[in-house]
Design a protein with these regions (language model features):
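Short loop/turn segments that flank or connect secondary-structure elements
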Residues: 58-163, 172-185
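N-terminal cysteine/histidine-rich coordination modules
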Residues: 1-56, 61
């Protein structure tokens, strides 16, 4: 969006984790406020109208009607953890939150590089986005403790990773599917 730039592009103005988005990872989007390739966004326009606040929760009018229904459906990333992620970033401090976000991004890149059979990108993105960091660390440790996977075909490696991630999600009753927005009308 013209005139909208931010120094922190990994964690968006509205609280979404751009660092874990497939569009950002693939180089198709620079992240929130990252310059060329950024999509038009009503929330970014609102930020400009309110003095360019770095994050919406720093605006005195937050939460505002712009967020009505915002978390009801997903885009390239799940929206359902957005408010929880904002709370965590404010509680831990942005620097600590961003360090954890970078660790999640590294885990996601590892899954995509070593366990993606060409059909699991959305699943891995969603799982890393929604699962707590400690669960992701456990899954990666379990995968790393299975050297026989290195000798197996991509499909078998992918299935092993999917199984462990799904088990972690099931233990927490987390659905690893993106939610579609209900159609208006």
């Amino acid at each position: 969006m013209k005139g909208f730039t931010r120094t922190e592009t990994r964690f968006s103005l509205c609280g979404l984790n751009c660092a874990l988005c497939s569009m950002h990872l693939g180089g198709y989007c620079p992240g929130c406020g990252g310059g060329a390739g950024n999509q038009s966004c009503a929330i970014a326009k609102c930020s400009l109208e309110h003095g360019g606040v770095p994050f919406c929760w720093e605006c005195p009018e937050y939460p505002c009607p712009r967020y009505d229904g915002f978390d009801d459906g997903d885009s390239f990333v799940p929206h359902r953890n957005r408010q929880q992620d904002i709370a965590q970033a404010t509680e831990l401090g942005l620097d600590v939150y961003l360090m954890q976000l970078e660790e999640k991004r590294n885990i996601l890149e590892g899954l995509l590089a070593h366990y993606n059979d060409g059909h699991r990108k959305t699943f891995f993105n969603t799982a890393v986005y929604l699962l707590p960091l400690e669960d992701l660390r456990s899954v990666m440790a379990a995968l790393n403790n299975r050297p026989e996977l290195d000798e197996q075909a991509g499909k078998e490696r992918a299935l092993a990773a999917v199984e462990l991630l799904q088990e972690a999600a099931d233990r927490r009753s987390i659905s690893l599917k993106l939610n579609k927005k209900a159609k208006k009308g």
